[in-house]
Amino acid sequence: MDTELLKTFLEVSRTRHFGRAAESLYLTQSAVSFRIRQLENQLGVNLFTRHRNNIRLTAAGEKLLPYAEMLMSTWQAARKEVAHTSRHNEFSIGASASLWECMLNQWLGRLYQNQDAHTGLQFEARIAQRQSLVKQLHERQLDLLITTEAPKMDEFSSQLLGYFTLALYTSAPSKLKGDLNYLRLEWGPDFQQHEAGLIGADEVPILTTSSAELAQQQIAMLNGCTWLPVSWARKKGGLHTVVDSTTLSRPLYAIWLQNSDKNALIRDLLKINVLDEVY
C-alpha cells in the first residue's frame, strides 16, 4: 500500500477538511480527494461521509485509523534508522536556484573553509522548488531548507538569517518599466502576491524562471527587466536599475525539523553568516 495514501487519510481525519489537509500536505485539494478515492478503491469501502463541509469518518474509517497510525509510525521509524546509517556524515541543504546562485554558493564555500569542527562532513547542495523541499524536509530526506518564507508547520524550527535587498534591473541605463518586458524570477508566493503593484496589474511576464543567472542573461536579448539582489547585480556588472522602480527587502530563513537528530550541527553551521555577501 502507498504510504502517501495513508498519510493523506490521516491528515483528512485530523483536520476533517480537504482544503486544510491539502494545505498541510502542500497538495491541491483535488490531489487530496484523488488519494482518498484511491485508498477507498483499494479497500473497497468508503472512509469518509461528506455532507457539504461536514466530513466524518465512517465505521470503516474509524477501524482503519489506528492501523494507519501504527503503519505510518513504523514506516517513519524504519526510514529514520536506514537514513541514519547511510547519511551519518552527509548534510543536505536545499534552496531555490536563485538563492544558490546569488548568495548560498558563497556560504557553502565558507562552510568548507570552517570544517575543522566537522571534519569529514559531506555536503549536498540541493536545488528544487520550495514546495518540493518542504516535503523532503518533512520526510527527513533533507536536513536544512533556506527560503524567503517563514515555516507554516508546527514541527519545524526556524531562524531568521537576515534580509537582502531586491531591485528591478535591466541591461541599459535610463529605462522605464513601460519600455521593458517583464521577466519573472521566482522569489516565493508571498512576493508574487505584491508583484502586480510593483510592476503593473496588466503586466504579463514573457519568461518565468527560478534561475537568476538565466534571467540576467536573457534581459538584454528580450529587452527585459527582473528583480535581482542588489549586491549580486553590482558584482555582475552591466546591469542598471529601472528608473521608475523601487527597492524592497526580503527575509531569509533557515528551516529544519524540530526533532532532527542534527539540531546541534545545524545551529553550529548557522553561526557562519549566510548573508555576509548580501545586504
From Swiss-Prot:
Keywords per UniProt: DNA-binding, Repressor, Transcription, Transcription regulation
Alphabetized Gene3D superfamilies for the sequence: Periplasmic binding protein-like II, Winged helix-like DNA-binding domain superfamily/Winged helix DNA-binding domain
PROSITE patterns linked to this entry: HTH_LYSR
GO biological process: negative regulation of DNA-templated transcription
Superkingdom classification of source: Bacteria
SUPFAM superfamilies reported in the protein's UniProt record: Periplasmic binding protein-like II, Winged helix' DNA-binding domain
InterPro entries, per database record: LTTR, LysR_subst-bd, Tscrpt_reg_HTH_HdfR, Tscrpt_reg_HTH_LysR, WH-like_DNA-bd_sf, WH_DNA-bd_sf
Pfam families referenced in this protein's UniProt entry, alphabetically: HTH_1, LysR_substrate
GO MF terms held by the record: DNA binding; DNA-binding transcription factor activity
Domain HTH lysR-type: 1-58
Feature: DNA-binding region: 18-37
Family: Belongs to the LysR transcriptional regulatory family.
Entry function: Negatively regulates the transcription of the flagellar master operon flhDC by binding to the upstream region of the operon.
Protein's recorded name: HTH-type transcriptional regulator HdfR
Biological source species: Shigella boydii serotype 18 (strain CDC 3083-94 / BS512)
Species classification: Bacteria, Pseudomonadati, Pseudomonadota, Gammaproteobacteria, Enterobacterales
